[in-house]
UniProtKB/Swiss-Prot annotation:
Annotated localization: Membrane
Name of the protein: Cysteine repeat modular protein 2
Function, in words: Required for mucocyst secretion.
Signal sequence, start to end: 1-23
Ranges occupied by FU repeats: 53-98, 104-151, 161-208, 210-263, 267-315, 317-362, 373-422, 427-492, 496-546, 554-602, 606-639, 640-686, 690-739, 760-814, 818-865
Taxonomic lineage of the native organism: Eukaryota, Sar, Alveolata, Ciliophora, Intramacronucleata
Transmembrane parts of this sequence: 1599-1619, 1662-1682, 1704-1724, 1763-1783, 1796-1816
Species of the source: Tetrahymena thermophila (strain SB210)
Length: 1915
């Protein structure tokens, strides 16, 4: 029966393939035939078009849209991220960042400046592109480093890395070689060019210019530059050093004054001589040594110069001529030759000027000579501009100081006195720091902050110091200010009162840690972080018991809906997985209790609505034979529960022969229940509406409609009338026909006897059994002979049959409705209906088309006759319509350009070979890199009776395979796998494969054998390593030399791992290209972590394994470039060369792309042929009874059978009371095991797979379950297979966190048990993804099994560890290596970690300031090994029977250690050695089931005492086949025993299985754990105590009462709102929609916000309503749920009433209070401000007094308002106090006291918050805001803001006591918003007039004074 079901399923799928391929043969791939034309196939959402099957297949569950194959996603479901056409749960952190649009999120590539990035921005980099500098502080990549950083190029490996190194704190830019050497400085700092340091004040003999301290000229003590914009100009001296004198004219220091100048010893300046002197000894006229022209020197001492001419004249030769008009005395006619000036002029040198030049001042004091006029005297050295004090002529006051000096208190100083002032370069003065800075460097850079005392407070508050850096439009901006509160992203550090930056995940915070967040970052509406426990997460933390999601509204982590076990961000009902009892809808993130009838079923193993089988619309499970109903176009085969496709022309059908509706272009023919392209012409017409063939009226022969007047032709004996009806020939005899109604229209014919009929004027004999007829055929009878047993039915004389007789004669079929036999069509001799398309056997000369049950004389288009001797037509599948075109060979309905493997070309056909065929799929050649490569060789086999394949390996003539490696194959391929290091380098090998065929002359190995020779390459010879380190930047240099490559590609690279163990730091640099030389690595962010007098350890690991992998990838890429490669060769080249999951991931995209290219570029007939060949081999298998052998002996409890239904597999038929795949179990043991398997299956089915920990645990459980796979029933197997596929898919998503070797080992172990079970499901052969998965698993299984087979041959020498200690000073100068080899293959599979810390040497003891560093370079291959040789003793020779009662679980093993292929003896080791001891039998891993118990004890044999001991050896871990023990000493033989607490001490090895089951049976803790998981959804069961249920119900009821009362109050206030609204409209008095403020909720949402009701106050009021509504009920629940005594239980009713009363009263008072507050506001605005005249508006102008009155009024109003609120709410406590006194018991008083206390605290907190807000609001208002508030109270709202922009001018005129001019006010008017006073309403009103009419200019010129007067008038 099972075989029959599978065969039916196979035929159905083949039919679908034929149908689709037939359409594809006409239309291109991706198109289908529709109404005679090819149209593109459109698949529904969540599906893609599978070009191989020609169907729409489902996308992966994570994809919302895909192409090509299920996992090639183009759009992802919510909660997944699209990356390289894959949907991931999170983006790869090092390559992408998250970018969301709507609900679709994509992993976008990093910015072009980054090669790796992280976070939510594309500019948060980990590594930079070429030409960009990396800033480690802010993780950015820049073309040029920012200010404060210097650009450095560091050699790392063979490449160079560009870094931005931080400069010294005061530097803006610094040197590339030394970050402490500044190039430019920050603001208010100056570069000392001598030291390259930035200083705030330049040293002596230097001056400041453009941020630089420049050296003064020679002789200058202080100097400055007169033109800072041109630093190359000459400096000017201010003072001179000793021995030099200041030349004021040239601003230089000279040793001697020039002619006309004299030294002033007091000031060390060169002063000009008297104007009459050319040269002098002092400045007076008495010290002249030489006179000007026209003057003569007087005799005597002192001497002076006298004018030779009268005053106002000068001497010219012998004449006295008049001086210039400005000169009163002169020595020439020019204005430049004056010696004294007239009134109004000042003598400057020898020139008379009206104003003295810059640097001089008017010296007003008169000289002793009254005729002398004032002169222009020099300003003091530090002054650039100065003036003489009018009251004190001796005092010279500076106006502007020279550069480098600053004006302070009337003097020029070089530095300002203290930091409360700052030096302003613009004004060259000392300005006070701007509040709130207490000390500062500039107006915008504070150093410390001032304190301030808000009004009403006693103690002052200090402003917060904030240093903030942000990116502005002009670049990076640095602010150092004092702020009252820290901005977003910063928090206040109370220790130093400064703003410190928050954690980058926090938007606001209260500290620097991740757990100090107040709010979280928001990048955009779809990209934000969520808060949970004061920490921000990209994805909320969830557990199985507490699933959470990120709510985008509150930005918090909230619980998922109760039906979700995990959900997506944004909606608690958008589920990712479901709780037990709920199922995740297909392609919808919703959990439902039932699945919809949309082709899905409830999968309890995954809690999902999984897809039904092929064609099902509803089903019981996902298998093909579990359908309940079918999709359109399919029908249900009831006997097999399978949905089969309807015939191609049918849109719907009930079976293959009964169509219900037809596809476009076909019509339903009811006579045969089939769809035809053309209706019969006789008796039917086409109804296009119904798309069916409708019978004509009975009177018509042919017609075009169903009426009797729509005839086209008539039957014999009638004629066609003009009205379309048929009329009988009434005028003619019964045997005649007529042409019309007259007798003359009759056609006279002879009268025939009975049994004859008239034909062409002659009487001919009827068909036998006919009495009368119309022809000679069987279906032309009119009546039957009465003497025979026949009856007339549909013009045929049929033999009468009984109701129970269904057998008809040949040529007839049985009609079950009419219980009669009817004749077949004339083309058929056997049929099931009347039509020619209902034949099962054809008449002679006709060919049967089996799939469409049609007989025709020749094969129809699309069919061919495969065998000329068989009258049957088969459908063409590919490349043909009817036979093959020229150049093609025909085979099995396919056309080939070349006959496939296993066949031979014979003319135009391909025929199968009679003998088996065998060949290698590829030639290894001489490119095998044996040292690193896993070599896989594929064998192609065609054999109908294939039994096995044997492999041998030779070197020369030596067979080194150690016996043939036998493989039982399952299909036409086989593989041989050579693990790494199994072959020698530079060696020639011969691989030989032979097959055994039981029926075709392949009885021994040499009959059918192929072989090929290949050459291995030379090995890579490793060179020397050396390490150097630079202490400045923690820079490591790796020196590699002496490597040989020998025909290996040069582009070898390696990975570098650097580990700082003292700081737990790990640095990873991957993919460095190899070259001999130096590789430099800069370890980031560690230079400040090194400490003196403390050991620092580094671990540098060289990954030799990656070198080998890259060689494989190079070879693979070369293969991919060969476009002629076949699919099989391509698959083999991929799967034979990958060894880790990372390589699978990296090659996946390339693999699928190449696969698509191959599939589209070459014919797919090969693939179709392979499937046909597979089924041909399958159907030809014969069962053979064979004897059991050593490999399969059925445990001695059964017989061996070579089964035809299991692909040549040898199976066991067990004896009675035995069961299992190999009859290894007894029946009662089987029953016990099955009970636990049910629980375990449920366990793994309910484990979520969204976390790595859950995934690993599931793998462990699955691995254990596979040991018992032979006892699984069908349902359990299906569950395990589904879970297995889930696990495999999840592995691809989390594989970056998986240790590759361990997972590969587990996958292989799991696959080796499940592979045969999966193959039994034939549907998997037609699913490409599952076929691909199975092939991958086959390869894994083959690879690992052969690893283990060749394990003993792959041991390498144990390399002794060399360790050298090097100590040195802090400036590290040298380092050494420690070479550690990797463990063996088995240890890599079994160990928890790779290179453990235990392999590093212990810290070194040292003294002083020496620091020791140790570097280890660990290579991953070749691997050292400790091998254990298994000694199979019949009995334990070392163990007395009385020593250990517990049985041995393992073999007795002997530990043997080799070095240089020589056995060595080692007694002690420096660290624990791990020893893998094989088990006697594979057993489950008990540590998985009971993780907190140790199941085994490791022991060793002490040869001295001759007993086994446990000291010095310990149990570490186990798997199904080995136990790992750790030993501190190497000694003899080892074993493992089972602990007594696990099993019965008397248990023997023969019943080890029974012992294992007993463990399960006795493990009550495990059973309880299973039950808890199974019943996790049933924890809300019935409680035995009904009082608990009642008490939990009552508080909920009280809450409903409170809500009901609250709704009643809302209704009342809505009614009031409507009444108030109408009243306002009737009275024409409506002030700014004040009725909005009646109802609090309506007002909160829609009401205007004013100074009385800002948003914060409304939010507090609304929160108060919620608190009052639920607070008291919460207290009731809390108190009532305490352990209650009898009195508490008796007063439940009273407490309910009280609780409802409290809640209702609280809500009512809150709403009434709010309403009264609104009324007070309206009353206050309309009456108290106007009628009571609290403000005086009678003044002519707005003054500060008005503002003060507004402030005072607001204070009084708010105090009265909140005082009333407090009294109203405090009054609520009176009834509560009365109720307290009415109860006497202590419990009741405690209850009400708690309620009252909570009530009081609630109201006090409300009042404190509101009053505090009132004061803050008032006192924080600016003067402008207070003035605006004044107008707001008068009814003028927002336009006042624009009108009052003249605040500064008002303030200016108020200070002057003036009124603002009208034109100033007019300039501030608004063209669109005009204010006017409406006289008849007595209320100011705002008129909006926008673009409606041209506003009168007079209205635009309203003056401020008129506006104030209007306000006064309206009072």
């Amino acid at each position: 029966m099972k075989f029959k079901k599978e065969l039916i399923n196979i035929l159905a799928l083949i039919f679908v393939l034929k149908k689709n391929i037939f359409a594809q043969s006409i239309c291109p791939t991706g198109y289908q035939m529709t109404q005679g034309s090819c149209t593109a196939i459109q698949c529904p959402n969540g599906q893609y078009y599978d070009s191989n099957l020609g169907l729409c297949a489902n996308c992966d569950q994570a994809c919302s849209a895909c192409n090509y194959y299920p996992t090639y996603c183009t759009q992802c479901q919510n909660g997944f991220y699209l990356y390289q056409n894959q949907c991931l749960t999170q983006c790869p952190q090092a390559q992408t960042y998250v970018s969301c649009s709507g609900s679709s999120c994509i992993c976008q590539a990093c910015d072009s400046s980054c090669t790796q990035c992280f976070g939510n921005k594309n500019t948060q980099c980990l590594a930079c592109s070429v030409g960009f500098y990396y800033n480690q502080i802010n993780s950015s990549c820049l073309k040029q480093c920012e200010d404060g950083y210097t650009q450095q190029i560091v050699n790392i490996g063979a490449s160079q890395q560009l870094l931005c190194i931080p400069c010294d704190n005061n530097c803006r830019t610094c040197s590339q070689t030394n970050a402490q050497q500044c190039l430019t400085c920050k603001d208010n700092m100056y570069l000392n060019t001598a030291t390259n340091q930035c200083v705030s004040t330049c040293p002596q003999l230097q001056y400041k210019i453009n941020g630089i301290c420049k050296i003064c000229p020679t002789g200058c003590q202080t100097c400055y530059n007169t033109n800072p914009s041109n630093p190359s100009t000459v400096e000017s001296c201010l003072s001179c050093v000793s021995g030099y004198f200041l030349d004021i004219e040239n601003q230089l220091c000279v040793k001697n004054c020039v002619s006309g100048y004299v030294v002033d010893a007091a000031t060390q300046r060169c002063l000009p001589c008297n104007a009459t002197c050319k040269n002098c000894s002092d400045q007076t006229n008495q010290g002249c040594l030489q006179c000007q022209n026209g003057y003569s020197l007087t005799s005597g001492s002192p001497s002076s110069c006298q004018n030779n001419c009268p005053n106002g004249n000068y001497q010219n030769s012998s004449l006295c001529l008049s001086c210039n008009t400005a000169c009163s005395e002169c020595f020439g006619a020019d204005n430049q030759q004056c010696t004294a000036c007239k009134t109004g002029y000042y003598l400057y040198k020898t020139q008379c000027l009206v104003i003295c030049p810059v640097g001089f001042y008017t010296f007003a004091r008169q000289y002793a000579d009254p005729l002398k006029q004032p002169i222009c005297d020099y300003c003091p050295n530090e002054m650039e501009q100065c003036e003489q004090d009018k009251s004190n002529f001796d005092l010279i006051k500076p106006i502007l100081c020279k550069r480098g000096y600053y004006l302070y208190n009337g003097t020029c100083v070089k530095t300002c006195p203290d930091q409360t002032y700052y030096q302003d370069e613009a004004t060259r003065s000392c300005l006070p720091c701007v509040f709130p800075c207490q000390t500062c460097l500039s107006a915008s850079v504070c150093l410390t902050c001032a304190t301030y005392t808000p009004n009403g407070q006693v103690q002052g508050q200090t402003y917060i110091f904030a240093q903030i850096t942000y990116n502005g439009p002009q670049g990076t901006v640095f602010q150092q200010n004092c702020v009252p509160a820290c901005p977003k992203g910063f928090y206040q550090n109370s220790k130093n009162n400064s703003c410190q930056v928050c954690n980058q995940q926090c938007q606001t915070c209260q500290g620097p840690a991740q757990t100090d967040c107040i709010t979280c970052q928001i990048y955009d509406s779809n990209n934000m972080l969520f808060k949970y426990n004061n920490q921000c997460y990209y994805t909320c933390p969830s557990s199985q018991n507490n699933p959470m999601y990120g709510d985008k509204t509150t930005q918090a982590c909230l619980p998922c809906s109760q039906e979700c076990s995990s959900c997506f961000n944004g909606n608690n009902k958008s589920c990712y997985s479901c709780m037990n009892g709920y199922f995740l809808e297909y392609l919808k993130p919703e959990c439902k209790s039932f699945c919809a009838s949309d082709g899905t079923y409830m999968n309890s193993s995954t809690n999902q609505c999984s897809l039904c089988g092929f064609g099902c619309s509803s089903c019981t499970n996902g298998t093909f034979n579990s359908c309940i109903s079918c999709l359109n176009g399919y029908y249900l085969q009831q006997n097999y529960n399978v949905c089969y496709p309807c015939p191609q022309q049918c849109a719907s059908c009930t079976d293959m022969n009964t169509c219900q509706s037809c596809n476009q272009g076909y019509f339903l023919y009811s006579q045969t229940n089939s769809c035809v392209q053309q209706c019969p012409l006789i008796g039917f017409y086409v109804d296009t509406t119904q798309q069916a063939c409708i019978p004509c009226d009975a009177s018509c022969l042919e017609c075009y409609g169903g009426a009797n007047n729509q005839c086209i032709s008539c039957p014999k004996g009638s004629y066609l009338k003009t009205d379309g009806t048929c009329q009988q020939c009434s005028q003619c005899s019964s045997n005649n026909e007529c042409l019309g109604p007259n007798i003359t229209d009759c056609l006279n014919q002879p009268i025939c006897k009975p049994g004859q009929y008239l034909y062409d004027g002659q009487c001919l004999t009827c068909f036998p059994y006919c009495s009368t007829c119309s022809g000679t055929t069987y279906d032309s009878c009119i009546s039957c002979q009465t003497t025979t047993d026949y009856t007339l039915l549909f013009d045929v004389c049929k033999k009468k049959v009984s109701q129970t007789d269904t057998q008809c004669d040949i040529g007839f079929y049985y009609d079950s409705v009419n219980k009669q036999c009817y004749s077949c069509h004339q083309n058929c001799i056997q049929c099931f209906g009347k039509s020619s398309s209902q034949c099962t056997k054809c008449s002679s000369g006709y060919l049967l088309h089996l799939d469409i049950t049609t007989c025709s004389s020749t094969c129809l288009d699309g069919y061919y006759q495969q065998d000329p001797s068989i009258p049957q037509c088969s459908p063409c599948l590919y490349n043909c319509i009817n036979g093959c075109s020229s150049g093609y060979q025909f085979l099995l309905g396919l056309c080939f350009t070349q006959c496939p493997f296993g066949t031979t070309a014979q003319k135009e056909n391909c025929s199968f070979n009679s003998k088996p065929s065998i060949q290698f799929a590829q030639n290894l050649g001489n490119s095998v890199n044996n040292n690193s490569q896993t070599i896989s060789l594929q064998l192609l086999v065609y054999s109908k009776n294939l039994f096995s394949i044997k492999w041998r390996l030779f070197t020369g003539n030596t067979d080194i395979s150690n016996g043939p490696i036998q493989s039982y194959i399952q299909n036409r391929f086989d593989y041989i796998v050579f693990p790494p290091k199994s072959l020698q380098s530079n060696t020639q090998y011969t691989i030989q494969a032979s097959i055994l065929d039981l029926a075709n002359n392949c009885q021994n190995e040499n009959d059918c054998m192929v072989q090929q020779t290949f050459q291995t390459m030379n090995a890579i010879t490793k060179g020397n390593f050396n390490i150097e380190i630079n202490s400045a930047y923690l820079q490591l240099t790796l020196i590699i030399s002496g490597w040989l490559f020998n025909s290996v590609p040069d582009n070898i690279s390696f990975d570098l791992y650097v580990k700082l163990t003292g700081n737990d730091y790990f640095f990873f640099d991957k993919g460095q290209n190899y070259q001999d030389g130096r590789f430099t690595y800069l370890i980031p962010n560690l230079s400040y972590d090194l400490q003196d007098n403390k050991a620092q350890f580094f671990l540098v690991i060289y990954n030799d394994f990656d070198v080998q992998i890259q060689q494989l990838l190079i070879a693979l890429n070369l293969n991919l470039q060969q476009t002629t490669i076949s699919i099989d060769e391509f698959l083999d080249s991929v799967y034979s060369k990958i060894t880790t999951l990372q390589q699978i991931q990296s090659l996946s995209y390339q693999f699928y792309s190449q696969m698509q290219n191959l599939m589209s570029s070459q014919t797919t007939s090969q693939t179709i042929f392979n499937r046909h060949l597979f089924y041909q081999v399958y159907s030809s298998l014969k069962g053979v009874q064979i004897p059991c052998d050593s490999n399969i002996n059925c445990s001695g409890n059964g017989k061996c059978l070579w089964s035809q239904d299991n692909y040549n597999e040898i199976l066991c038929i067990c004896n009675i009371n035995y069961a299992g795949r190999y009859c290894e179990f007894q029946s009662y043991q089987l029953d016990i095991a099955r009970q636990h398997l049910i629980a375990l299956t449920d366990l793994i089915s309910n484990i979520p797979l969204n976390k790595s920990s859950d995934l690993f645990f599931t793998i462990e459980v699955l691995l254990e379950l596979t040991y018992f796979y032979s006892i699984f029933d069908e349902f359990t197997l299906n569950t395990l297979i589904n879970v297995y596929f889930q696990v495999f898919n999840q592995l691809q998503r989390v594989q970056s966190n998986i240790s590759d070797e361990k997972i590969l080992f587990k996958i292989s172990k799991l696959t080796s048990q499940l592979i045969n079970l999966i193959n039994e499901d034939q549907t998997l052969s037609y699913n490409d993804q599952q076929s691909l998965l199975m092939k991958t698993m086959n390869d894994f299984d083959s690879q690992i099994n052969l690893y283990l087979q060749n394990f003993a041959k792959s041991f390498d020498d144990l390399k002794s560890q060399e360790q050298v200690q090097t100590s040195f000073q802090t400036d590290i100068s040298n380092i050494n290596l420690n070479l550690i080899y990797q463990n063996d293959l088995l240890d890599a599979f079994m160990s928890n970690n790779g290179a453990s810390d235990g392999q590093q040497q212990t810290p070194i003891v040292f003294y002083g300031d020496q620091i020791s560093y140790t570097f280890d370079i660990t290579q991953f291959s070749p691997k050292s090994s400790l091998s254990t040789a298994v000694i199979k003793w019949n009995s334990n020779p070392f163990l007395s029977q009385s020593q250990y009662q517990a049985p041995f679980i393992s073999c007795i093993t002997e530990l043997v250690i080799y070095s240089q292929q020589t056995e060595i003896q080692i007694s002690t080791v420096s660290q624990i050695v791990e020893i893998a001891i094989p088990k006697i039998l594979p057993t489950p891993i008990l540590s998985v089931i009971r993780p907190f118990y140790q199941p085994y004890t490791c022991i060793y044999f002490d040869s001295v005492s001759q007993v086994y001991k446990q000291d010095g050896v310990q149990y570490l871990r186990e798997n199904s086949t080995h136990v790992i023990c750790g030993s501190e000493q190497i000694s003899g033989n080892y074993g493992v025993i089972v602990n007594q607490e696990y099993i019965d001490p008397n248990l023997s090895l023969t019943v080890i299985w029974n012992a294992t089951q007993q463990i399960y049976a006795n493990d009550q803790q495990f059973i309880n754990f299973i039950n808890q998981l199974i019943n996790s959804n049933n924890n809300n069961g019935t409680n035995e105590n009904p009082q608990v249920s009642q008490s939990s119900f009552n508080p909920n009821l009280s809450l409903l009462y409170a809500l009901l009362i609250y709704i009643i109050f809302i209704t009342i206030f809505i009614v009031i709102s409507i009444i108030r609204d109408r009243k306002d409209q009737e009275t024409y008095i409506k002030e700014s929609d004040s009725y909005w403020l009646v109802h609090p909720i309506y007002s909160l949402i829609f009401g205007p916000y004013s100074s009385f009701f800002p948003r914060l106050q409304r939010s507090i009021n609304y929160a108060q309503l919620i608190i009052n509504l639920f607070l008291y009920n919460a207290i009731f629940v809390l108190v009532y749920s305490l352990p209650s005594e009898q009195e508490l239980q008796q007063n439940v009713g009273k407490r309910q009433i009280i609780s409802i009363q409290i809640s209702s009263t609280s809500v009512a008072c809150s709403i009434v209070t709010y309403y009264l507050t609104i009324c007070m506001v309206n009353l206050f605005k309309m009456k108290w401000y106007i009628k009571q005249k609290w403000l005086d508006f009678k003044q002519d102008k707005i003054t500060t007094e008005i503002v003060e009155q507004v402030t005072k009024s607001l204070k009084i109003f708010h105090l009265m308002n909140y005082g009333l609120v407090f009294m109203l709410q405090a009054g609520m406590g009176i009834p509560i106090i009365i109720l307290i006194l009415s109860f006497n018991s202590q419990q009741n008083q405690f209850f009400f006291t708690s309620v009252f206390a909570s009530f009081v605290i609630d109201n006090i907190l409300d009042i404190i918050i509101l009053i505090s807000f009132c004061f803050i609001k008032i006192f924080s208002q600016s003067e402008k805001s207070k003035i605006i508030l004044l107008f707001t109270l008068r009814g003028f709202y927002y336009p006042v803001y624009e009108f009052l922009d003249i605040e500064d001018k008002i303030k200016e005129y108020q200070q002057k006591g003036e009124v603002l001019p009208a034109e100033e006010a007019n300039n501030q008017s608004d063209d669109e918003d005009i204010f006017e006073i409406n006289d008849h309403m007595n209320t100011p009103k705002r008129i909006f007039k926008k673009n409606e009419e041209k506003i009168d200019k007079a209205q635009e010129e309203i003056q401020l004074n008129e506006f104030v007067n209007n306000l006064k008038t309206n009072q």
